[in-house]
Amino acid sequence: MVVVGMRHIVCFSGGHSSAVAAVEVVRKFGAEDTILLNHDLCPRTEDADIKRFKKQVSDYLGVPITYANMPGWDVKDQFDVCMEIKAFKAGAQSTAFCTNRLKTEPFHKWLSEHYPANPPEVRDDISLVYGFDANEQHRIRRRVGIMAAMGYQTEYPLTWEVRTIHDIEEVGIERPKTYSIFNHANCTGCLKAGKQHWFVVYCLYPEIWGKAKLS
């Protein structure tokens, strides 16, 4: 059921999946009821081609990017953030502090300022859109629970039975070149990444490798 006047807030990471989700949402609900919410990151570690990709997707959809940024985002990278609080993460199962500071806190602040909720009531006039697919049911269940507890509903276009697009190249946009060497569009030097990612950083990004060693 389509709710008239509902705003669909796409958590637009700059990665391929969230871009495809954004296309599906705009095609189904319209650009006027869609918000592309992004967290701009330090240009030292968010590849310039990811920024190119975000702009091209925004231009194609006719929806400007709305930014919810951490203060100092343009000069502080993931290493700076963790050094400031003298920790990487609180426990083995917790989210890395860089994600919390660079994305989660600005996201929650933006929501509270623009679309405040009153849990346990769930707002019925907005929906938060994520690019999780049908193979990520554990992530979907977790996100549904977290956001519902905060008073928000969520939707997952990549799980819809009827899809209009599967690859962003179908609309003439190339996905970020980072996908040719990594399997994601996270920061170069992602603190959640494994050995393979860091071996590539060591080989191709000596400045980032050097800063990581000193952090």
What name fits each language-model region?
Residues V2-S215:
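Nucleotide-activated chemistry modules centered on ATP-dependent adenylation/adenylyltransferase
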